[in-house]
Amino acid sequence: MENLTRELRKADISLCLDFVMNHTASTHRWAMAAKAGDATYQAYYHCYDDRTIPDQYEQTVPQVFPNTAPGNFTWCEEMHKWVLTTFHDYQWDLNYANPAVFVDMTKSILHLANLGVEVFRIDAVPYIWKQLGTTCRNLPQVHTIVRMLRMVLECVCPAVILKGEVVMAPKELAAYFGTPEKPECHMLYNVSTMVNLWGALASRDTRLLKAQLDALHALPDNCWFVNYLRCHDDIGWGLDEAVENRLGIDPQKHKEYLYHFYEGNFPGSWAKGELYNYDPATGDARSCGTTASLCGVEQ
């Protein structure tokens, strides 16, 4: 890693590394120790002997992948315990209510910074704090943890940048910058603009995009967005429903139009995307595809 970052720096390239905040792999050494019965490392995760507490969580916590990874908990035969797994059964959610987790995660990021990593793309940030009776998304404690991490970095390696991967509703996004007095992420992916660009292209209506850009321009100067067209993730059609309603757009019908358009299942569509995670109960779905496929280059 040191050799890589050294060579990159010679070419004026800063290395950006993905740093997953919410979970570890089930094969990570912490998880393996937990499976072996080490109570210290079992406390690094959310482990339960029976379904009492997991069932309480399931009442309020949405499922990320209801079709491919239903439920938010996985049974671990080695421990004879249920483990919180928000995304997939092989991704164990960390328990930040245990201070040792924050300490060890901070040690990990500082170790990588010492090896020359200059930008950290902190992944799945909104999910890192769990609290019964909530959606376990965007809770106040999440912002406290990100702020603490930023404070440590500013003290130890102030040139390091935190780039937040926050795939949430527009109203939740800007909060991850913090405030000028209490900053959190240096940069955020501009998810809302990406979604609204594709929405405007399919609908040939720029009103939602303009409203979203107007809201961005009203943010303080410390808000630094990374604009992009596509990435490895699907497109979740999380448009601002309040703005849609104000403009006379039916949010559900508009969403259905967009994901059908981008799978090529609509008259006049040029796209060759794929429908992803369709939920017939809610009518919700996401869209997958490269920029070329969604723009109709294959046609």
List the model feature ranges, each with a label:
Residues 1-299:
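Active-site and adjacent substrate-binding regions of carbohydrate-active enzymes
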